[in-house]
Swiss-Prot record:
Belongs to the type IB topoisomerase family. Residues 1-50 form a transit peptide. GO terms for molecular function: DNA binding; DNA topoisomerase type I (single strand cut, ATP-independent) activity. It comes from Homo sapiens. Residues 261-262, 324-329, 421-423 are annotated as: Interaction with DNA. This is DNA topoisomerase I, mitochondrial. The gene is TOP1MT.
Length: 601
């Protein structure tokens, strides 16, 4: 308890400004080096706590256009006979028909959910006829959309320009808002059209119908004195409110998971930049508390209270394995996903010895978005002993941490440090890991391509830590074959250039004149250029192979302080564009303005 009291005192002193900051040279907020753009717009015009804006005006969301029925020549067949579908049933049939060549339509769960929801959209007489998905033929529908996509690819330059102008006009009308007197870009002003839910991993709701959203589903958020957006003709908004403690412009509930969706500001906006900056600053602040927190949870492994022991072991997993805390779910929710606090006995196996290590814990469960988390990891002996204790006399479906809830864990984290959550731990460990990996992997003398490979390897370590997986892309084999073909062709060019260089060297040795020397230098430069190109292709192939099942983008955009990457780019003379795309550079404009080459997380 002494450590907890010290942590609370430290947190209070930090809020009062009494705890000394780290030296400016380490890139701490407040240092000139870090605050390179001290007049940046995300630092100006701050409101009191909780208030995000004074003025918010926008045009509302853009709705998906109404469904256009299929041409008469495109038919749906059942048991080999054409069936004329009602407009509602036909629209849902097109969602499936578009995906006919996709892996999803081979999955039983997807097919079952689709057929159940499709039948709900059918007229009574259609349901009496169409009783089995296996007897349905969507071939003509699929071919129609394939041909339509192919036609779009061969549009004339004038037709493409016209489509581009229409998109820009839409962007100008709906894609911007006025926030406190400044024009800000909106991130996603289009409401998602209806379709079939896919989900990630083996989601139990895949194939279900995502219904069309109408203005009657949408809540508008804007300032009281602004012009309220006009709903489409013949419609009205579900509600209009003025809540300046949130940053969304419109919200609605989607039909599959009953989750709330939002129209938000673009990530490069002032408010989003400020929010991201504060998120990473909170994670940086954990650095001053983390040693004491770790000492505390280690001490709690021996607590007399079972609740305290369970909390300490859970916190160890959140810290060391970057597990999510896990939120309590409503009874009957279909997806059996869990986090650290909701782990069951069946999700954990204990091995006294495995893979040459002692006290190994094997995790196997479905995490967020139904992504499988599988890991075998050695743990400290007290953790192993406690897990044995927690699992005693329990059935496989019983909770591992039966005295712990997400709410009680979060409350404890707040007591340790103001603003501390499991996600802050995740962000801290991800960012620290990237920084340490970059330091260990990068060599100043490496080529740009080799440095980028080192960066992606560091990013990969973080993605694996955070369990950011992806399925191997369907185009992977083909793209690798193309890459290997390029590598082979480049090797042949290098061999030919090397032979030409030998001949030029022999000629120069025999003649010794200026002309032969010029030819020799030209051949040498060509060989160097080709060798560099070959090295880049080889690095690209290695990078592609290593990351075929790892999603680097999720951690890069959400869990890694961009100032670490920008400082690394500046320190090792790597163009920032090699790490962040144009859109990502706009998103992290605040970090580009702040981070010097000596920034440390």
């Amino acid at each position: 308890m002494r450590v907890v009291r010290l942590l609370r005192l430290r947190a209070a002193l930090t809020l009062l400004g009494e705890v000394p900051r780290r030296p400016a040279s380490r890139g701490v907020p407040g240092s000139r080096r870090t605050q390179k753009g001290s007049g940046a717009r995300w630092e100006k015009e701050k409101h009191e706590d909780g208030v995000k804006w004074r003025q918010l005006e926008h045009k509302g969301p853009y709705f998906a256009p109404p469904y256009e029925p299929l041409p008469d020549g495109v038919r749906f067949f059942y048991e080999g006979r054409p069936v004329r579908l009602s407009v509602a049933a036909e629209e849902v049939a097109t969602f499936y028909g578009r995906m006919l060549d996709h892996e999803y339509t081979t999955k039983e769960v997807f097919r079952k959910n689709f057929f159940n929801d499709w039948r709900k959209e059918m007229a009574v007489e259609e349901r009496e006829v169409i009783k089995s998905l296996d007897k349905c033929d969507f071939t003509e529908i699929h071919r129609y959309f394939v041909d339509k996509a192919a036609a779009r690819k061969v549009l004339s330059r004038e037709e493409k320009q016209k489509l581009k102008e229409e998109a820009e006009k839409l962007q100008q009308e709906f894609g911007y808002c006025i926030l406190d007197g400044h024009q800000e870009k909106i991130g996603n002003f289009k409401i998602e059209p209806p379709g079939l839910f896919r989900g990630r991993g083996d989601h139990p709701k895949m194939g279900m119908l995502k219904r069309r959203i109408t203005p009657e589903d949408v809540v508008i958020n804007c300032s009281r004195d602004s012009k309220i957006p006009e709903p489409p003709a013949g419609h009205q908004w579900k509600e209009v409110r003025s809540d300046n403690t949130v940053t969304w412009l419109a919200a609605w509930t989607e039909s599959v998971q009953n989750s709330i969706k939002y129209i938000m500001l673009n990530p490069c906006s002032k408010l989003k930049g400020e929010t991201a900056w504060q998120k990473f600053e909170t994670a940086r602040r954990l650095r001053g508390f983390v040693d004491e927190i770790r000492s505390q949870y280690r001490a709690d492994w021996k607590s007399r209270e079972m609740k305290t022991r369970q909390r300490a072991v859970a916190l160890y997993f959140i810290d060391k394995l970057a597990l999510r805390a896990g939120n309590e779910k409503e009874d009957g929710e279909a997806a059996d996903t869990v986090g650290c606090c909701s782990l069951r006995v069946e999700h954990v196996q204990l091995h006294p010895e495995a893979d040459g290590c002692q006290h190994v814990v094997e995790f196997d469960f479905l995490g967020k978005d139904c992504i499988r988390y599988y890991n075998r990891v050695p743990v400290e002996k007290p953790v192993y002993k406690n897990l044995q204790l927690f699992m005693e006399n329990k059935d496989p479906r019983d909770d591992l941490f039966d005295r712990l809830t997400t709410t009680s864990l979060n409350k404890h984290l707040q007591e340790l440090m103001d603003g501390l959550t499991a996600k802050v731990f995740r962000t801290y460990n991800a960012s620290i890991t990237l920084q340490e990996q970059l330091r260990a992997l990068t060599r100043a003398e490496d080529s740009i391509a080799a440095k980028i490979l080192s960066y992606n390897r560091a990013n990969r370590v973080v993605a694996i830590l955070c369990n950011h997986q992806r399925a191997t892309p369907s185009t992977f084999e083909k793209s690798m074959q193309n890459l290997q073909t390029k590598i082979q062709a480049k090797k042949e060019q290098v061999a030919e250039a090397r032979a030409e260089l030998r001949r030029a060297r022999a000629e120069h040795k025999a003649q010794g004149d200026g002309k032969s020397r010029s030819v020799l230098e030209k051949k040498r430069r060509l060989l160097e250029k080709l060798q560099e190109q070959l090295a880049q292709l080889s690095v690209q192939a290695t990078d592609k192979e290593e990351n075929k099942q790892v999603a680097l983008g999720t951690s890069k955009l959400n869990y890694l302080d961009p100032r670490i990457s920008i400082a690394w780019c500046k320190r090792f003379r790597v163009p920032v564009e090699k790490i962040y795309s144009k859109t990502q550079r706009e998103r992290f404009a605040w970090a580009l303005a702040m981070a010097g080459e000596d920034f440390e997380f």
